[in-house]
Amino acid sequence: MKQIKLLLLLASASVTGALAQSNGLTDMSQSRFAKMANTGIGAVHWTDGFWGDRFQVFSRTSLQSMWNTWNAPEISHGFRNFEIAAGVCKGEHWGPPFHDGDMYKWMEGVASVYAVNKDLELDKLMDNFITCVVKAQRADGYIHTPVVIEELNKGIDSHALEDQHKQTVIGTKVGDEDEKGAFANRLNFETYNLGHLMMAGIVHRRATGKTTLFDAAVKATDFLCHFYETASAELARNAICPSHYMGVVEMYRATGNPRYLELSKNLIDIRGMVENGTDDNQDRIPFRDQYRAMGHAVRANYLYAGVADVYAETGEQQLMKNLTSIWNDIVTRKMYVTGACGALYDGTSPDGTCYEPDSIQKVHQSYGRPYQLPNSTAHNETCANIGNMLFNWRMLEVTGDAKYADLVETCLYNSVLSGISLDGKKYFYTNPLRISADLPYTLRWPKERTEYISCFCCPPNT
């Protein structure tokens, strides 16, 4: 009898542990080629000490402060854009096209905190936001407030269409920055936004048990599957800041839908297969030919993290060769002691050549040449440093090697923590190692932390 009770106890503990792992921010508990899996998002509580204090500041101050900013139309249209797209009020889209994704990141942060403290006010706040997101989403699953608002203002009620995927891609002038149609301009950041919607929907379901936002994420992922099955090679280049690589793989883990895993593999296959790719966007050459870190550091690190997710599910050794080589290039030649990366404000690709002027490519907020690591003019965007942490977190899970945990810790204590003030209300976009008042030129971003940054991607990421 005692043996039976012991076996039941062990079985119960095993099931409990598996459930906790499957409720993590990422769920690699069933990933065939991962050696580790993290705990559930509500399974660990900071009770005291340095990180206990940071958690309290973030949960009590930062989340509400960000919401107040996004809910103040005179400062930011972050939430107002969703209200307009949902038909709650009328108006024009205002602000950068990636604000949707930034709000989804904030939503993911709120859900993560709610998983720990079960604050009912946070639950109401999330429900309020989710209601607008669901109303703003098109019937085919597409959601991008600049496009949806434009459609509404032209008298097109895309919310009312019943049949999935019967809407056509509006944009036809690929690369025209004045074109606002769906996927017309790769700099509209649609896939970036959709990727963060996926992650927010997953984390919200794991934290609350509700499926409202998750259902919207499923519809968006299905739309993306259809898009990449039918889109031209040119349109398929839409992968600016590819958070959707991570998002699609996590959706596969959350649903078991094999279409999502196939999509994640396809995203890597088509990368670099079109003309006029850029080092800045890591698509001048196919990913499997890349062995050095290049270009825009946020885009790069998001890409590397997403590819690590794909490796965890497929075990493709070529991808691990690329990731290992790129990681070594970053850590030994292109990273600061703080874990910060992306040293250049603006520059030219190291792979360009003055002997072939047509091949010289501009880069921005990017990795530079080996050891090109200035102190006073370092860009080191907070999102790039967080991306470095996301990349190393996934490499830790798939390899079990502690060197990746060391890098996560280095970033967290230094180049990520520097992005937010002690009171949790002000933020840095850039994180130079030295700030000087005597520079003979003016840098683009302020030298002091501010409550609102026009590129508000870093605060919710932090």
Locations of regions flagged by a protein language model:
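Bacterial Sec-dependent N-terminal signal peptides
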Residues: M1-N23
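Glycan-recognition and catalytic cores of secretory/periplasmic carbohydrate-active enzymes
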Residues: Q21-T462
